[in-house]
């Protein structure tokens, strides 16, 4: 479904190079030390960075140089990127039509996603009137309403308290299963990864150092466990 073949990004003339295959509907965690290249990997998939070499295909279609706006990918960051002067409904609606001219079917889709996120009673509010968790629900709704086959998460819930973070992770996992979306999530927490991703990828020094079952990492038996400070 998603295939990266020697995708290379030159960082201060030091190449970061990734090869990775992810199947449709998989939920994969991307782990590793700070500065290892996790966010770079996601930005290459999303199209925010243009690789120096290599190829990237989605459903066997070459998207190596496709601009972000035309790539079949949605991405959610720690900074939710909501527009402060637009209502919740308008922020979500941007995912359907940048001009916010929604037809009846699009209006219904927007409200259905809002109900799924538990924010249907907040549609007339501005982002500044919401809690941090509510703002991330709005940002997630905007991603989901686009119905792209791939969802990328770059630690969007790291600023939330532990209980709320787990609630959001469960919501993401369930939503991806319902929409049959492929999920790649950058995280610093193996415990968070284990909640929604049976498979993990460990990035170190701009390379994929290990990939396999998340449970193996948690047990401390995987070769990459030590990179994450886990001992058996």
UniProtKB/Swiss-Prot annotation:
<protein>
    <recommendedName>
        <fullName>Thiamine import ATP-binding protein ThiQ</fullName>
        <ecNumber>7.6.2.15</ecNumber>
    </recommendedName>
</protein>
<dbReference type="Pfam" id="PF00005">
    <property type="entry name" value="ABC_tran"/>
</dbReference>
<keyword id="KW-0813">Transport</keyword>
<dbReference type="InterPro" id="IPR050093">
    <property type="entry name" value="ABC_SmlMolc_Importer"/>
</dbReference>
<keyword id="KW-0997">Cell inner membrane</keyword>
<keyword id="KW-0547">Nucleotide-binding</keyword>
<dbReference type="GO" id="GO:0048502">
    <property type="term" value="F:ABC-type thiamine transporter activity"/>
</dbReference>
<dbReference type="GO" id="GO:0005886">
    <property type="term" value="C:plasma membrane"/>
</dbReference>
<comment type="subunit">
    <text>The complex is composed of two ATP-binding proteins (ThiQ), two transmembrane proteins (ThiP) and a solute-binding protein (ThiB).</text>
</comment>
<dbReference type="InterPro" id="IPR017871">
    <property type="entry name" value="ABC_transporter-like_CS"/>
</dbReference>
<feature type="domain" description="ABC transporter">
    <location>
        <begin position="2"/>
        <end position="230"/>
    </location>
</feature>
<keyword id="KW-0067">ATP-binding</keyword>
<keyword id="KW-1278">Translocase</keyword>
<dbReference type="GO" id="GO:0016887">
    <property type="term" value="F:ATP hydrolysis activity"/>
</dbReference>
<dbReference type="InterPro" id="IPR027417">
    <property type="entry name" value="P-loop_NTPase"/>
</dbReference>
<dbReference type="GO" id="GO:0005524">
    <property type="term" value="F:ATP binding"/>
</dbReference>
<feature type="binding site">
    <location>
        <begin position="32"/>
        <end position="39"/>
    </location>
    <ligand>
        <name>ATP</name>
    </ligand>
</feature>
<dbReference type="InterPro" id="IPR003593">
    <property type="entry name" value="AAA+_ATPase"/>
</dbReference>
<comment type="similarity">
    <text>Belongs to the ABC transporter superfamily. Thiamine importer (TC 3.A.1.19.1) family.</text>
</comment>
<comment type="function">
    <text>Part of the ABC transporter complex ThiBPQ involved in thiamine import. Responsible for energy coupling to the transport system.</text>
</comment>
<keyword id="KW-1003">Cell membrane</keyword>
<dbReference type="InterPro" id="IPR005968">
    <property type="entry name" value="Thiamine_ABC_ThiQ"/>
</dbReference>
<keyword id="KW-0472">Membrane</keyword>
<dbReference type="InterPro" id="IPR003439">
    <property type="entry name" value="ABC_transporter-like_ATP-bd"/>
</dbReference>
């Amino acid at each position: 479904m998603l295939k990266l073949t020697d995708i290379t990004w030159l960082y201060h003339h030091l190449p970061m190079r990734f090869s990775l295959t992810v199947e449709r509907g998989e939920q994969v965690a991307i782990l590793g030390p700070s500065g290892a290249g996790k966010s770079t990997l996601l930005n290459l998939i999303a199209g925010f960075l243009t690789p120096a070499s290599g190829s990237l295909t989605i459903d066997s279609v070459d998207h190596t140089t496709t601009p972000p706006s035309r790539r079949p990918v949605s991405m959610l960051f720690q900074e939710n990127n909501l527009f402060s002067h637009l209502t919740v409904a308008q922020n979500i609606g941007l995912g359907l039509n940048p001009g916010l001219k929604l037809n009846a079917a699009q209006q219904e889709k927007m409200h259905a996603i809002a109900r799924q996120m538990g924010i249907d009673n907040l549609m007339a509010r501005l982002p500044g009137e919401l809690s941090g968790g509510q703002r991330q629900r709005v940002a997630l709704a905007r991603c989901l309403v686009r119905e792209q086959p791939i969802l990328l998460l770059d630690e969007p819930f790291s600023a939330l308290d532990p209980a709320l973070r787990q609630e959001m992770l469960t919501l993401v996992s369930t939503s991806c299963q319902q929409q049959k979306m492929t999920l790649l999530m950058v995280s610093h927490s193996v415990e968070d990864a284990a909640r929604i991703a049976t498979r993990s990828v460990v990035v170190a020094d701009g390379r994929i150092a290990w990939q396999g079952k998340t449970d193996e990492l948690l047990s401390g038996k995987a070769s990459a466990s030590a990179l994450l400070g886990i001992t058996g």
